[in-house]
């Protein structure tokens, strides 16, 4: 029985990217919401809610990026020159966020500066992730197996709008995480922010669902052609279901339901992108088979992935299990 190794690896990398988005998304969302909570005590609790897990969440970014370079080198060599600027700014934002997270607990006199760095780094990293996604969706020109565009091709109204939409989406993840992990006045305020961000996310998903099909003929065929239209019609219905669960959970104070609903919205958005892209890894220039490394390399790397991915899943699940439940405002991890 022959295995379609490029397809298997595309699924692994897609899973790693999705895991990064939904896991690092909520702690970036906490940083995005930082300016809306002025009290030092609230900010301390917010940071303590993500302190045990935030750095482990970025493991999935390393797996996704490293896997892309090793398994789909042609796609990596094509996408990277097209997105140098947003990716570099994203990494700088993540560095600022990480440094601020640690140094904020070590100083009192300059604490407000690290608060600014934490919020600013989270916003820059999120916005640039959205811009990079928008630039990929709108298409990257390829000629002779190399990037054929200009330095600023990534900066368009569509990519900027995608960056803003991701800021709203991560704010939703962060707010629902705070609803689930905190209590009292902080959780009550987080519910208000979650409802606003949820409405914004729903509107953004609707706008991009109407906008994206007209970016490429491939997308239009995927969303409105038969038989894929039968699957694509399910996505907006499920989105509305997740939004209803979000609102119901916020109103009835079932604190885990809003976070699960927010995760569902991101999974459905990711599924929509998958419907639009497949079988392309660089739309509409390179398929996963055209961009893949030799079969021998894919098989060798798959052996390592079959060991590492379950290990990452196991320690991630264990960390979340150990630190489950509400954060005690009087205790912390720093």
Where are these regions (language model features)?
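Central hydrophobic cores of alpha-helical transmembrane segments
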Residues: 260-267
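N-terminal signal-anchor module of multipass membrane proteins
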Residues: 1-56, 62-65
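Long, contiguous internal "core" modules enriched in hydrophobic/ aromatic residues
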Residues: 103-255, 272
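Juxtamembrane membrane-water interface segments of multi-pass membrane proteins
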Residues: 28-52, 70-75, 79, 102-112, ...
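Alpha-helical transmembrane segments
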Residues: 9-20, 81-92, 119-124, 153-167, ...
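Helix-coil boundary and interhelical linker segments in multi-pass alpha-helical membrane proteins
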Residues: 1-13, 69-84, 137-157, 214
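Short, membrane-exposed interhelical loops at transmembrane-helix boundaries
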Residues: 282-301
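Membrane-interface helix-loop-helix modules in multi-pass inner-membrane proteins
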Residues: 53-122, 143, 222-230
